[in-house]
């Protein structure tokens, strides 16, 4: 017996995507917008292990040359920004699902955040959930300050794959994308 069209709702038709992370020799500020099945640093970074020197966020680090018990970064995620140091220019491909959106807890002051989106949006719209608490958001080359006239802001579109420093005046929740959207990716809450 053939099923009806309503039976199709039980299936998940999302497909995986491949994120390409371009890394230059030295330190890079990056983020991931895909979630692989296994987000352990050793697994995700396996293709570049010979060139990887270290990856770290604000609280943890992973160095492939160290014994496993000295590495405190045990899982990567789409919410954090990461400093990645490589010995030479290399490209990393990460295959996984793109979340529909994410809710991230931010603390008063500077936060190292990821950008879990497959396409870029204007900072003014992406930061709307934080209201007037946003002081500045910046990556290595561009910045956005809501108190400045638009022509002084060099960050006009947030770029997938980059990490960002976000400064806020109080603790809050930053909602990126549509966390209630269904069928187009995983919903990520922190």
Give each language-model segment a name:
Residues 1-190:
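N-terminal exported-region signature
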